[in-house]
C-alpha cells in the first residue's frame, strides 16, 4: 500500500492483494462469472473424500491450493483412492476431460482490449498445461463468443486492470468456465502475441 501511495501502481495494490488467494473466484461467481463447480476447504483436515465426490457428482477430482501457482501442490483423485494429507487451504473441482480433449484457453487483455489468445495443451498422459510438465502453447484466433466470455469476466471487476490474463476451460456443455484470473504478474506470452509490448506501453502512457 505504501508504494501505491507514493507512485502510480498498475495493477493497483488493492486488486493485487485481492488476487493473491484463489478465494477471489468466489467473489467473481457471486457477480455472475461462470466457474467450474468448486468446494472450498479452508480447513482440509478430516475431510470426507466420498462426500466431495458426491457433492460434485463426479468420480474424478482435482485438488488445488488456494494460494499458489504453477500447479504446485495440485493433484487428481479418483473415487476410492486414499486422500493424501493436506496442510493448506484447498479448493476442489471435478476433473473435466476437456482439459485433455481441447486444452486451456488463455486470453490476454490490455486495458480491457484483447491482445491475443492462445491454446495451452498438456503433454500426453498429463493434465497440467504448464511447460514445466511438458505443456505447449499455440496462438489461436478465438471466436467472438469465447472472447466475449473472457471479457465478461473483466466486466465483473470494480476496476479495470491495466493487464489481465483470463484462463478458461470449456465445460462439458461447451460453455467456457473461468479457471483463473491472473492480475499480479501473469506471463503474457509475447511470442504468441508480439504486439502486446507496444499495446501495454500505449495503455500505460494513457494512464499516467
What are these regions (language model features)?
Residues 1, 18, 24, 40, ...:
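Tryptophan-centric aromatic hotspots in well-structured domains and transmembrane helices
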Residues 2-6, 13-102, 144-147, 208:
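Active-site nucleotide/adenylate-binding loops and adjacent lid/helix of ATP-dependent enzymes
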Residues 36-37, 93, 115, 164-166, ...:
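A short, local hydrophobic-aromatic micro-motif
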Residues 39, 66, 95-96, 108, ...:
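Anionic group-transfer/hydrolysis microenvironments
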Residues 15-18, 120-122, 169-173:
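Short glycine-enriched loops at secondary-structure junctions
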Residues 144-208:
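ATP-dependent carboxylate activation and anion-phosphoryl transfer catalytic cores
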Residues 67-158, 177:
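Phosphate-binding site of ATP-dependent enzymes
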Amino acid at each position: 500500500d505504501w508504494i501505491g501511495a507514493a507512485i502510480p501502481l498498475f495493477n493497483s495494490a488493492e486488486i493485487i492483494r485481492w488476487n493473491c488467494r484463489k478465494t477471489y473466484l468466489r467473489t467473481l461467481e457471486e457477480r455472475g462469472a461462470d466457474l467450474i463447480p468448486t468446494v472450498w476447504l479452508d480447513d482440509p483436515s478430516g475431510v470426507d473424500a466420498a462426500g466431495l465426490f458426491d457433492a460434485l457428482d463426479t468420480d474424478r477430482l482435482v485438488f488445488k491450493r488456494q494460494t499458489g501457482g504453477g500447479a504446485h501442490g495440485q493433484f487428481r483423485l479418483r473415487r476410492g483412492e486414499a486422500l493424501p494429507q493436506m496442510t493448506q487451504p484447498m479448493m476442489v473441482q471435478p476433473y473435466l476431460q476437456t482439459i485433455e480433449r481441447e486444452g486451456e484457453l488463455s486470453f490476454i487483455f490490455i486495458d480491457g482490449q484483447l491482445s491475443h489468445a492462445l491454446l495451452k495443451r498438456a503433454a500426453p498422459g498429463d493434465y497440467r498445461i504448464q511447460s514445466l510438465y511438458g505443456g505447449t502453447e499455440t496462438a489461436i484466433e478465438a471466436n467472438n463468443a469465447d472472447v466475449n466470455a473472457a471479457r465478461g469476466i473483466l466486466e465483473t471487476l470494480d476496476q479495470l486492470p491495466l493487464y489481465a490474463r483470463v484462463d478458461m476451460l470449456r465445460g462439458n456443455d461447451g460453455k467456457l468456465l473461468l479457471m483463473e484470473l491472473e492480475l499480479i504478474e501473469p506471463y503474457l506470452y509475447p511470442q504468441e502475441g508480439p504486439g502486446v509490448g507496444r499495446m501495454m506501453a500505449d495503455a500505460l502512457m494513457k494512464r499516467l
